Amino acid sequence: MKRIEAYTDGACSGNPGPGGWGALLRWNGNEKELKGGEAETTNNRMELMAAISALSALKEPCEVDLYTDSVYVRDGISGWIEGWKRNGWKTAAKKPVKNAELWQALDEARKAHKVTWHWIKGHAGHPENERADELARAGMEPFKYAGHRTLKVK
């Protein structure tokens, strides 16, 4: 199985407001950068989109070390999601899970792979995380002055 390092980040101006996501994939000395954004979104949605996009870009089953600076993504995928699925996508307080469609997409995207989730402190000088942040901000840029639409930028 191919081993991949994925560094993901999301950004949002306004929260809600225009947002972007970025991902840096590394394997065997190769790199691939991904980015995209939306006109009206939240930082948590963009963090999820970054992870979904990174895993969905892989064309074959891989061993993935996925690095995120989002405690929301790390805690959700490493713990909360199993309870949400058991509870019909409701929280322990019986409220609908926020961003359920994205959590479901992330759950689906990870199935083909062996993913190890890592949390890293954001904006702490970690070069790959800083690059993912730059990609997320670049993915947001077209939406800062645009109408409500979605654009995937490669």
Curated annotation (Swiss-Prot):
Its main location: cytoplasm. It is found in: Cytoplasm. Keywords: Cytoplasm, Endonuclease, Hydrolase, Magnesium, Metal-binding, Nuclease. Its EC number is 3.1.26.4. Mg(2+) 2 binds at D9, D133. Transmembrane segments: none annotated. Endonuclease that specifically degrades the RNA of RNA-DNA hybrids. This is Ribonuclease H. It comes from Brucella abortus (strain 2308). The lineage of its organism: Bacteria, Pseudomonadati, Pseudomonadota, Alphaproteobacteria, Hyphomicrobiales.
